[in-house]
Amino acid sequence: MEQQSDGLKVMVIDDSKTIRRTAETLLKKVGCDVITAIDGFDALAKIADTHPNIIFVDIMMPRLDGYQTCALIKNNSAFKSTPVIMLSSKDGLFDKAKGRIVGSDQYLTKPFSKEELLGAIKAHVPSFTPVDAVS
């Protein structure tokens, strides 16, 4: 498997295989190194091993939900400055507020577009320059 050492490390945590694959495909096309996790427990071990530059996390997941996962990331001194973007099919004010309380940096509603994903990355990792994908 080819490793892009200069690619931005992006983690996508979602229990939906479709969402993980979609995000992974979109992000790899612009030069990102994508790490996926199926839930918060899976993600925490991978975060410690890979040190992603930005993390996208679904809210509604079994075992350890997105709010709990975000809080654990933000309470860890090694990762508290890592941007965490919440992903949810809900677009409610309460959900967004709860995300802010646990330390999330942004909130994206699913389904998301390539532009929304890249916009979130650019907003929180200003040095990121997407590679132009060949159509």
Swiss-Prot record:
Domain annotation Response regulatory: ranges: 9-125
PTM section of the record: Phosphorylated.
Keyword Phosphoprotein in annotation: yes
Residues with 4-aspartylphosphate modification: 58
A single BP term in Gene Ontology: phosphorelay signal transduction system
Pfam families from the UniProt entry: Response_reg
Gene3D superfamilies in the record: 3.40.50.2300
Keyword annotations: Phosphoprotein, Two-component regulatory system
Superkingdom as given in the UniProt entry: Bacteria
Consequence of gene loss (knockout): Deletion results in decreased cAMP, surface piliation, and twitching motility. Supplementation of pilG mutant with exogenous cAMP restores surface piliation but not twitching motility, suggesting that PilG regulates pilus biogenesis and function by at least two pathways.
InterPro entries according to UniProt: Bact_response_regulator, CheY-like_superfamily, Sig_transdc_resp-reg_receiver
Function: Plays an essential role in both cAMP-dependent and independent regulation of twitching motility. Regulates the cAMP-independent coordination of type IV pilus (T4P) biogenesis and retraction that plays a role in surface and host cell adhesion, colonization, biofilm maturation, virulence, and twitching. In addition, phosphorylated PilG is necessary for cAMP production via regulation of the adenylate cyclase CyaB. Acts therefore as a response regulator of the chemosensory system/Chp system.
Protein name: Protein PilG
Organism: Pseudomonas aeruginosa (strain ATCC 15692 / DSM 22644 / CIP 104116 / JCM 14847 / LMG 12228 / 1C / PRS 101 / PAO1)
